[in-house]
């Protein structure tokens, strides 16, 4: 993920009160890139970094006051707009799922249970790859920053 994407994702996550890792996880699972459109079997199209589905274009046009053509162009070529749209969609999904992040992430992909579950599995795999393997090029944290191990803590 490019640093510019990370900055947009952090800003959008904060604005929409989303967990900071949610948008990078979606991007990794979607595999989208700036300037890319992917045609789907159902005739819809997924646009840009976060693969925003064309079914969202009318709602985005209404909320921005832009034409649908302008929204499509921005979804394709403006990664921060694309990420902002993804954040708004995920926020809506969180409301719809009563705060259940895993379900909201699945609904980001599809409301169909089978597709939803498959996507959640793919998204979880992306999260594990992104967030559980430390970068071997980074130095370890100094021990003074880490709390003492539970067995060495003095009783109260």
Describe each model-derived feature in a short phrase.
Residues 147-149, 153:
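Gram-negative outer-membrane assembly/targeting C-terminal domains
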Residues 1, 154-156:
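Short, solvent-exposed mixed-charge patches
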Residues 2-142, 146:
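Catalytic glycan-binding domains that act on GlcNAc-containing polysaccharides
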């Amino acid at each position: 993920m490019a640093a510019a994407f990370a900055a947009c994702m952090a800003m959008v996550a904060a604005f929409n009160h989303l967990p900071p890792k949610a948008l990078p996880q979606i991007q990794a699972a979607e595999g989208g890139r700036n300037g890319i459109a992917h045609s789907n079997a159902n005739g819809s199209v997924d646009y840009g970094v976060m693969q925003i589905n064309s079914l969202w274009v009318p709602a985005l046009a209404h909320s921005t006051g832009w034409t649908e053509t302008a929204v499509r162009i921005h979804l394709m070529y403006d990664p921060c707009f694309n990420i902002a749209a993804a954040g708004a969609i995920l926020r809506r999904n969180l409301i719809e799922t009563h705060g259940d992040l895993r379900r909201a992430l699945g609904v980001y992909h599809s409301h169909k249970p089978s597709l939803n579950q498959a996507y959640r599995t793919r998204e979880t795999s992306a999260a594990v790859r992104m967030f559980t393997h430390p970068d071997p090029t980074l130095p370890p944290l100094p021990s003074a920053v880490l709390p003492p191990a539970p067995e060495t803590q003095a009783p109260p």
